[in-house]
């Protein structure tokens, strides 16, 4: 357990930051799921709309260190490829 005032404050800050990050990750995952669901349904317009919303979120969180930059790139690449394939098939 923390003995100094500084250590106690750091524990409080760490917990607050953890909860903030959990909320942000949850929001990001929700957007990814919405995009994946639109692709699965075959709705090109909804998929493109959700994709344009999720890309800046992924970039922002990658730049802030919430997720790794390669993970953001991987999500964007895979979703983009699926949307492109869906658009050409439709």
Curated annotation (Swiss-Prot):
UniProt keyword annotation of rRNA-binding present: yes
Gene Ontology MF: a single term: structural constituent of ribosome
Keyword line: Ribonucleoprotein, Ribosomal protein, RNA-binding, rRNA-binding
UniProt superkingdom: Bacteria
HAMAP family according to UniProt: Ribosomal_bS20
Family under the similarity heading: Belongs to the bacterial ribosomal protein bS20 family.
Name of the protein: Small ribosomal subunit protein bS20
Organism of this sequence: Francisella tularensis subsp. holarctica (strain LVS)
């Amino acid at each position: 357990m923390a003995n100094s005032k500084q250590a106690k404050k750091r524990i409080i800050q760490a917990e607050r930051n953890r909860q903030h990050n959990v909320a942000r990750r949850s929001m990001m995952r929700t957007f990814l799921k919405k995009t994946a669901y639109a692709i699965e349904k075959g709705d090109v317009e909804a998929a493109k709309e959700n994709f344009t919303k999720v890309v800046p979120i992924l970039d922002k969180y990658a730049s802030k260190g919430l997720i790794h930059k390669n993970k953001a790139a991987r999500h964007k690449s895979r979703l983009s490829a699926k949307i492109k394939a869906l658009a050409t098939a439709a």
